[in-house]
């Protein structure tokens, strides 16, 4: 299978060919049309699948756009940054489209699409906030190291968001200090997306 599904519920489609019928999982079928679907929280396994698909589609045709559809509550910062770096690394333009919810790292990846090719469906909710940290425990020196790393990561995420949205760094820093929820129209004004898609 080409995609990680934690619930194990992956629809299959039947494809007709001159050699007969063939069953194919929906994510593999979408991949044939250069569509990658991020519909889960972002973790290392999901990130590896998405990075592999991005690299595969680049090797198939480095000139044709790749479409990344996002309906994700976010997740791991390191996994999300790995996807982000791969999106910036590959040659094709990355068309991002949010549907449902693009929260946290989901919103970050939405904004990371190619400028002019970042979209949302009309009722999408987009949420920005600062990276979360679990309960830190251990020696004080270890907690201090992790706290410094969290601050450095937050700064880097805000720099990247500022670069992709055109918003001043200070505004991004203020807005991500708490949950900052936007609709599609507000996301256009903010610079996270470029347009709202109403019809295919």
UniProtKB/Swiss-Prot annotation:
Q: Which domain of life is it from?
A: Bacteria
Q: Which Gene3D superfamilies match?
A: 2-enoyl-CoA Hydratase, Chain A, domain 1 (3.90.226.10)
What does the record give as the active site? 104, 129
Q: Which UniProt keywords apply?
A: Cytoplasm, Hydrolase, Protease, Serine protease
Its localization reads: Cytoplasm
Reactions catalysed according to its record:
Hydrolysis of proteins to small peptides in the presence of ATP and magnesium. alpha-casein is the usual test substrate. In the absence of ATP, only oligopeptides shorter than five residues are hydrolyzed (such as succinyl-Leu-Tyr-|-NHMec, and Leu-Tyr-Leu-|-Tyr-Trp, in which cleavage of the -Tyr-|-Leu- and -Tyr-|-Trp bonds also occurs)
User: Do you know which HAMAP family this protein is assigned to?
Assistant: ClpP
State the protein's name. ATP-dependent Clp protease proteolytic subunit
Q: Which organism is it from?
A: Rubrobacter xylanophilus (strain DSM 9941 / JCM 11954 / NBRC 16129 / PRD-1)
Q: Which gene encodes it?
A: clpP
């Amino acid at each position: 299978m080409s995609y990680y599904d934690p619930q194990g519920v992956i629809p299959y489609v039947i494809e007709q060919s001159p050699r007969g019928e063939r069953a194919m999982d929906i994510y593999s079928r979408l991949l044939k049309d250069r569509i990658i679907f991020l519909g889960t929280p972002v973790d290392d396994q999901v990130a590896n699948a998405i990075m592999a698909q991005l690299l595969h589609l680049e090797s198939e045709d480095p000139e044709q756009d790749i479409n990344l559809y996002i309906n994700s509550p976010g997740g791991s910062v390191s996994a999300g940054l790995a996807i982000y770096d791969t999106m910036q690394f590959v040659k094709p333009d990355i068309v991002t489209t949010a549907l449902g919810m693009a929260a946290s790292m989901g919103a970050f990846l939405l904004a990371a699409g190619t400028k002019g090719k970042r979209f949302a469906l009309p009722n999408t909710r987009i949420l920005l906030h600062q990276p979360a940290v679990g309960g830190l425990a251990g020696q004080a020196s270890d907690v201090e190291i992790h706290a410094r790393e969290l601050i450095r990561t937050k700064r880097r995420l805000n720099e990247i968001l500022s670069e992709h949205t055109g918003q001043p760094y200070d505004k991004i820093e203020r807005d991500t200090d708490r949950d900052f929820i936007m609709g599609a129209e507000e996301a256009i004004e903010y610079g996270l997306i470029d347009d709202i898609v109403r019809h295919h």
